[in-house]
Amino acid sequence: MPDAFQFAVWHLAARAAAWLRPPALMRGRETGPAAPSGISVVIPSRQGRQLLAPQLPGVLRDLPEDAEIIVVDNGSSDGTAAWLAAEWPMVQVELSADPLSFAAAVNRGITRARFSHVCLLNNDMLIEPGFFTALRRAFDRIPVLFCATAQIRFPAGVRREETGKAVMAQAHRDDFPIRCDEPIAGEDLTWVLYGSGGCSLYDAALLRVLGGMDEAYAPAYVEDLDVGYRAWQHGWPSVYVAGAVVEHRHRATTSRYFRELELAEILEVNYLRFLARAVADRRLFRKLWTDAIDRLRRRRDGALRNAAAIAIEGGAREHGHYPEERFLALTGGDVAVFPGTDESAPPLVEFAERLDTPPQTKLARHSEVVLVRSGNELARDAAIEWTGGKQPVGDKRAGGTPSREIRLPRES
């Protein structure tokens, strides 16, 4: 274990390096020709035959007619490719003899995908019926939606470490800066910072505009946060979909190749990499960076040794038009969305002391009720903006000016 002096040196170097981070880049990419409507399921798998066997039947049953499954079999010696060819001939196999990082594996699948939407699905996820329908429906409700992400449950008796409702918030300053909040009964289509790369549906064209997953995040973790954040910078949101449910056998692959302490350090290093590579606003970057390295020093976390080099090698790759502090307020754990029962009525955005299921009488008078924790005016303003942009259920308009008719009752 390094001594206190060594941690102090690493910390000082990291603080100085934050001022040397390269400026954000402006990059344009072509989206390519329009893809046919449908879903391409991309499943990265390493030595995963035993995980795929119980997963694939549910996926095949639930997929719509216009769909395909691509398994990216990488670094396997368990006969996965031959088994798929014999037992699941409808499944396409993208083969790599060498093991790939998560980002590299899914990017191979994304490149091969031919439909309008791409579902990234870990091989340790078991989907429940209606999974694909619920995710796809979100894109009919929300214009320019980037990602719809599923509700994540864990097997009985296993502590729930993920929920799908990802926010940037800390209960304590030494907590990891990203957490998953417990969904509220009746909550659906709440904005989230990003969708889990293990159970989310993406707009394939927008995903390609962003260059897919950033392969700097090796071997795994935080690449999904990175791409979701970069999408928000362009005004392309992600939402939590309560009706799309998966059961997750947590770290069924990574735990075979890395110890828990190694995985924890990979997560911390890649979070630093995310700050350096994704956060474009320089003032916001320096604040989040300082918070992160101060936290690592207090925890005496070895990830701090990498911080200075990560900052200097960084430089945000996107510089979109949508203010970062605005979408961080919207996805900071202070907002919850509840579908109403009157589709013809206007939505409602209001402050609340507690985020809890609204009474049925209120839901019956609105197409949607959005609760914002009292006092967070930036989140309230962002919620008004985004709620006004949603389409009514069944309205498939591709353009036009969204309705902004939103009542704002005074806080009592």
Which residues does each PLM region occupy?
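Glycine-rich, basic loop-to-helix element that forms the pyrophosphate-binding segment
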Residues: 96-113, 123
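A conserved acidic beta->alpha catalytic loop
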Residues: 58, 73-82, 98
